[in-house]
């Protein structure tokens, strides 16, 4: 698949969402709401579910599948209260010894005036700091777009995976082309230079695993992700805490 098709597929409105994975993978998934400071952000969803006999905290960025739903979800662009909700749930997971799984699909954090006034940069930075030392296993999965710091704020993890037809980048190809050439129409040319596809990033050790989507139905893909999570969470849970945190630190330090 060429780069243009991959970008289109990553942005496809009908693509599986965080809630699709959360309800399909985890038994008895219960959503939790609010950041306990300002409000609940519909762009970030999270809660608790069971993976076998293991309670897991699930957090992710949610896009809509219709115009009305996208308005509710702010087109998958979180406000600072969304990142603070995510952090609240992750700290709760740490308190009760639950591993964390995050699902990421965003063009980036919302850049509006209100979001900036409420501390968008601080919220993202705090997530990076807190996740780097969170004392439970973390697995992050990019399921569509992984855009800039808005994606990274949920991706400081022990394992970072990508669905095969997803992308992960410092900014959009359109933004890159506009900055580099002052011409947003050269977006796909920019995408080639940026190395944003799953297999390119796996080759560069930015991500740890690519989950194949070829020939799989939605149910089969969810089942595949569930199997991978069960295996990897069992492995990570066996690691001594000091070793887990040191490996997480070194994983990001090497960049």
Swiss-Prot record:
Cellular component annotations (GO), alphabetically ordered: acetyl-CoA carboxylase complex
Biological processes, Gene Ontology terms: fatty acid biosynthetic process; malonyl-CoA biosynthetic process
Keyword match Lipoprotein = no
**Its EC number(s):** 2.1.3.15
Question: Where primarily located?
Answer: cytoplasm
GO MF annotations in UniProt: acetyl-CoA carboxylase activity; ATP binding; carboxyl- or carbamoyltransferase activity
Where does the CoA carboxyltransferase C-terminal domain lie?
1-235
Q: Which PROSITE patterns match?
A: COA_CT_CTER
UniProt KW keywords: ATP-binding, Cytoplasm, Fatty acid biosynthesis, Fatty acid metabolism, Lipid biosynthesis, Lipid metabolism, Nucleotide-binding, Transferase
Reaction(s) catalysed by this chain's protein: N(6)-carboxybiotinyl-L-lysyl-[protein] + acetyl-CoA = N(6)-biotinyl-L-lysyl-[protein] + malonyl-CoA
Function (record text): Component of the acetyl coenzyme A carboxylase (ACC) complex. First, biotin carboxylase catalyzes the carboxylation of biotin on its carrier protein (BCCP) and then the CO(2) group is transferred by the carboxyltransferase to acetyl-CoA to form malonyl-CoA.
- HAMAP family (UniProt xref): AcetylCoA_CT_alpha
In which family does this protein belong, per the annotation?
Belongs to the AccA family.
Q: How does it assemble?
A: Acetyl-CoA carboxylase is a heterohexamer composed of biotin carboxyl carrier protein (AccB), biotin carboxylase (AccC) and two subunits each of ACCase subunit alpha (AccA) and ACCase subunit beta (AccD).
Kindly provide the name given to this protein in its UniProt entry: Acetyl-coenzyme A carboxylase carboxyl transferase subunit alpha
Q: Which organism is it from?
A: Streptococcus pneumoniae serotype 2 (strain D39 / NCTC 7466)
- What is the gene called? accA
